[in-house]
Regions:
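Extracytoplasmic/secreted proteins, especially bacterial periplasmic and envelope-associated proteins
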Residues: 50, 58, 62, 69, ...
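A short, polar/charged loop-to-alpha-helix boundary motif
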Residues: 37-47
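Active-site-proximal helix/loop microenvironment
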Residues: 135-178
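Beta-lactamase-like hydrolase cores
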Residues: 2-21, 106-109, 121-122
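Structural recognition of the beta-strand scaffold that forms the well-ordered cores
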Residues: 18-19, 28-30, 72-75, 107, ...
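A short, well-structured edge-of-sheet supersecondary motif
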Residues: 9-37, 136, 178
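Active-site SXXK
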Residues: 24-25, 48-76, 108, 164-168
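Conserved catalytic neighborhood of penicillin-recognizing serine enzymes
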Residues: 23, 68-129, 170, 174
Length: 178
């Protein structure tokens, strides 16, 4: 140290990154934010956020295990849910505010069609789908017991998402990160 000053700019927004070896579970890269020393908070392992559409493949995987195929047709059309007890109406939409009608599951997944994901979850049942998705290593208590689960409204850490996704990359086997 020469007694000089050092400057650093603390970013206003922070992020996290997790990279796992899907075959072994080895953590290849982990970034939990700008500075753990400043915040004592690791966003990669502690920050629970909604994964959004990156969660849909888990719902589709459950559908494939429940008799659907990549070629199965599912209706991408408007749907309305009425909660009589709360006197609320839910009209889910696709991000484009368009509907494509009957669409093959493979196309619906790569186009991230919300209504198809919701219909798949509805047809399989929320509780049985949660039981299936928990096999990827997710805590059932973090998975909402309603149809919004199909849109990725669970609260999960980046580590949990990366761990779940690793099963897709290694033939369906769950790993434990280390």
């Amino acid at each position: 140290d020469d007694g000089g000053l050092a400057f650093s700019q603390v970013p206003g927004a922070q992020s996290a990154l997790v990279t796992l070896d899907p075959n072994t579970g080895a953590i290849r890269a982990l970034v939990g934010g700008f500075s753990f020393e400043q915040s004592n908070y690791n966003r990669a392992t502690q920050a629970k956020r909604q994964p959004g559409s990156s969660f849909k493949p888990f719902v589709y995987s459950a559908a494939l295990d429940n008799g659907y195929t990549a070629a199965s047709l599912v209706n991408d059309a408007p749907i309305v849910f009425v909660d009589e007890y709360l006197d609320k109406v839910w009209r889910p939409k696709n991000d484009t505010n368009t509907f494509l009608g009957p669409i093959r599951m493979r196309e619906a997944l790569y186009k991230s069609r919300n209504l198809v994901s919701i219909r798949l979850l509805q047809s399989m049942g929320v509780d049985s789908t949660i039981d299936y998705i928990a096999k990827f290593g997710f805590n059932k208590q973090d998975l909402p017991r309603n149809l919004s689960l199909a849109l990725g409204t669970a609260t999960l850490t980046p580590m949990e998402i990366a761990t779940g996704w690793s099963a897709f990359a290694n033939g369906g086997y769950k790993i434990n990160p280390y």
